[in-house]
């Protein structure tokens, strides 16, 4: 089952998708937000059908002290809208620092400022989804198909 990860922004929604086994996240799309984020449900629904998505993970913005602000309430409302419209499980996932981490990775990759602007939301969605996938304890396979023995210990 594929899992979709979403990074909600005021102007864009970054979209990431897991591989069918749920081990790795890849960037998929950036959806321009026209009106309230709920207006983007149609495009997300198309992607869900196209890729056979069985679950959606929505980034939940939290303040550094763990409290929730207005953006978190928007994320909760959007997650509820998605769950109702798509009849899929939707999970909220802590997204603290993902945009900063995405920016750092893109700078290290020597992407121009213009190119970073184009892909940062997608990269943040990848980081949110990969964090979720890693938390699920799915064993990773080494090259050659060998299983190293289960989830990695921190």
UniProtKB/Swiss-Prot annotation:
Its EC number is 3.1.-.-. GO terms for cellular component: cytosol. GO terms for biological process: rRNA 5'-end processing. It is found in: Cytoplasm. GO terms for molecular function: nuclease activity. It comes from the Bacteria. The keyword Metal-binding does not apply. Keywords: Cytoplasm, Hydrolase, Nuclease, Ribosome biogenesis. It is an enzyme of class 3 (hydrolase). InterPro entries: RNaseH-like_sf, YqgF, YqgF/RNaseH-like_dom, YqgF/RNaseH-like_dom_sf. The keyword Cytoplasm applies. PANTHER family: POLYNUCLEOTIDYL TRANSFERASE, RIBONUCLEASE H-LIKE SUPERFAMILY PROTEIN (PTHR33317:SF4). Belongs to the YqgF nuclease family. Could be a nuclease involved in processing of the 5'-end of pre-16S rRNA. NCBIfam families: RNAse_H_YqgF. This is Putative pre-16S rRNA nuclease. It comes from Pelotomaculum thermopropionicum (strain DSM 13744 / JCM 10971 / SI).
